UniProtKB/Swiss-Prot annotation:
Species this chain originates from: Rattus norvegicus (Rat)
InterPro entries in the record: AN1-like_Znf, UIM_dom, Znf_AN1
Residues holding Zn(2+) 1: 10, 15, 33, 36
SUPFAM superfamilies hit by this protein: AN1-like Zinc finger
Annotated region (Disordered), positions in chain: 153-187
Record keywords, A-Z: Endoplasmic reticulum, Lipoprotein, Membrane, Metal-binding, Methylation, Phosphoprotein, Prenylation, Repeat, Zinc, Zinc-finger
Protein name, UniProt field: AN1-type zinc finger protein 2B
Propeptide: 255-257
Sites where the protein binds Zn(2+) 3: 100, 105, 123, 126
Binding site for Zn(2+) 2: 25, 28, 42, 44
Modified residues (Cysteine methyl ester): 254
Binding-site residues for Zn(2+) 4, renumbered to this chain: 115, 118, 132, 134
PROSITE patterns: UIM, ZF_AN1
Length: 257
């Protein structure tokens, strides 16, 4: 007696055996016999969906959960950066304490990389204003520019302070007190250099310092030095004249054939 509707044939092309107790693969949903139901025996193309492995942290030996489709190396790296309890990981977190403030980025750096426009801290990849969609306005000012502005403001404040002799009225003639005019605000560079260029102002300062350091020489000594210098120059000129005359009077050894 035959039962044609009982059982099913094996889906393996090389087998095709009629099995009365067929088995269904939970990965590819194929029907196989007991000999080919394993993933490796029928070369299942969907076996990777069931081959789930949980990576283990190499430092603390704790299993790290991984989402579907996420690389295990990335999950282990984030676990070491945030949740690992081992000594090397905790020491690393103490060094890399500057977290990037861009949304979605978890990178940490050893030093602060602050944006000059918005003032927030970012990692190396997102330190430029275009990389983190900077909301700050205007162009950033460098540290040298800020220092120059502060120096100019300091010079301007010192140049505009009135002297005590101008502000205090004279006690001898109180009736002749004149109304004081507001001080003029001049440029700190012009007030410092008196309208000269930088090279001229530097040369003028050097001349003044040399004049102050030079000792006062009596006028008689200056006259003696001048006379001595004139005598030396005259003797030098006379010697050169004698040398020129001796060279001109020297007979020439050249002869024309």
């Amino acid at each position: 007696m035959e039962f044609p509707d009982l059982g099913a044939h094996c889906s393996e092309p090389s087998c095709q055996r009629l099995d009365f107790l067929p088995l269904k693969c939970d990965a590819c949903s194929g029907i196989f016999c007991a000999d080919h139901v394993a993933y490796a025996h029928h070369h299942c193309g969907s076996a990777y969906q069931k081959d789930i492995q949980v990576p283990v942290c190499p430092l603390c030996n704790v299993p790290v959960p991984v989402a579907r489709g996420e690389p295990p190396d990335r999950a282990v790296g984030e676990h070491i950066d945030r949740d690992c309890r081992s000594d090397p990981a905790q020491q690393k977190r103490k060094i890399f304490t500057n977290k990037c403030e861009r949304s979605g980025c978890r990178q940490r750096e050893m030093m602060k990389l602050t944006c000059d426009r918005c003032g927030r801290n970012f990692c190396i990849k997102h330190r430029h204003p275009l990389d983190h969609d900077c909301s700050g306005e205007g162009h950033p000012t460098s540290r040298a520019g800020l220092a120059a502005i502060s120096r100019a403001q300091g010079l301007a404040s010192t140049s505009t302070v009135p002297s005590p002799s101008r502000t205090l009225p004279s006690s001898s003639s109180p009736s002749r007190a004149t109304p004081q005019l507001p001080p003029r605000t001049t440029s700190p560079v012009i007030a410092l250099q008196n309208g000269l260029s930088e090279d001229e102002a530097l040369q003028r300062a050097l001349e003044l310092s040399l004049a102050e350091a030079k000792p006062q020489i009596p006028s008689s000594q200056e006259e003696e030095d001048l006379a001595l210098a004139q005598a030396l120059s005259a003797s030098e000129a006379e010697y050169q004249q004698q040398q020129a005359q001796s060279r001109s009077l020297k007979p020439s050894n050249c002869s024309l054939c």
